[in-house]
From Swiss-Prot:
GO terms for cellular component: cytoplasm; nuclear speck; nucleus. Belongs to the SRY family. This is Sex-determining region Y protein. GO terms for molecular function: calmodulin binding; DNA-binding transcription activator activity, RNA polymerase II-specific; RNA polymerase II cis-regulatory region sequence-specific DNA binding. GO terms for biological process: cell differentiation; male sex determination; sex differentiation. It comes from Halichoerus grypus. It is found in: Nucleus speckle; Cytoplasm; Nucleus. Residues 24-53, 196-215 are annotated as: Disordered. The lineage of its organism: Eukaryota, Metazoa, Chordata, Craniata, Vertebrata. The keyword DNA-binding applies.
Length: 232
């Protein structure tokens, strides 16, 4: 009976001794390590250390804004980080040289630590990835304007059309110009251009096709014949 009690007491004592030891190991402040202190001061994290990337030492403004940024963020939780940076930059410019001097001294101390720890360090800024150029052309919008030119009486007249229906009307007009009847090409082109511009883009395809299918006006005894027209 006495031996059993001693065994239980010994097991309980071991458990009590292990619990505080585990607590001290878990909650021991990690900032006692000078390397961890330096990593905290320079803003390093596990991802950068895993990639073997050495961060630059903080300058005077970064040393000053480290605490100021935290204060501004607590006072204005809705403020975005970019707005906080602008406000801190303005406040830093308003400080006098005497007010800035302690932060310059701290920055020099951090730079000295950085040189001792990384004597071969060279600053290599990260390059921004350039977007890859695609060789594929984007599809043209249905409302995009396409133009062609027609040579009439040694002058080029632009002819504008929007879609396949307008192209069909343009081809039909070219076929009519190739017939034996004389036509005033310049007046016909100008009237077609005015008609297409006055047509609303909100019209339905059926209405647009009906407008474009209309024959251009003919002028029987006017200036130009078939031999004077040239189509590229």
């Amino acid at each position: 009976m006495f031996g059993v009690l001693n065994s239980n007491d010994h097991r309980a004592a071991v458990q009590q001794r292990n619990i505080p030891a585990f607590g001290r190991t878990s909650f021991e402040p990690w900032t006692d390590n000078p390397t961890s202190n330096y990593r905290c001061e320079t803003g390093g994290n596990g991802r950068d250390s895993g990639q073997n990337r050495v961060r630059r030492p903080m300058n005077a403004f970064m040393v000053w804004s480290r605490d100021q940024r935290r204060k501004v963020a607590l006072e204005n939780p809705q403020m975005q980080n970019s707005e906080i940076s602008k406000q801190l930059g303005y406040q830093w410019k308003m400080l006098t040289e005497a007010e800035k001097w302690p932060f310059f001294e701290e920055a020099q101390r951090l730079q000295a630590m950085h040189r001792e720890k990384y004597p071969d360090y060279k600053y290599r800024p990260r390059r921004k990835a350039l977007p890859q150029k695609s060789d594929k052309l984007l599809p043209a919008a249905s409302s995009s304007m396409l133009c062609r030119q027609v040579l009439v009486d040694e002058k080029w007249y632009p002819f504008t059309y929007r879609d396949s229906c307008s192209r069909a009307a343009h081809s039909r007009m070219e076929d009519q110009l190739s017939s034996s009847q004389p036509v005033n090409i310049a007046n016909s082109l100008l009237q077609q251009e005015h008609h297409y511009r006055s047509t609303s883009l909100g019209d339905s395809p059926e209405t647009l096709a009906a407008h474009l299918s209309a024959d251009p006006p003919f002028y029987p005894k006017e200036q130009l014949g078939l031999s004077d027209a040239y189509f590229p």
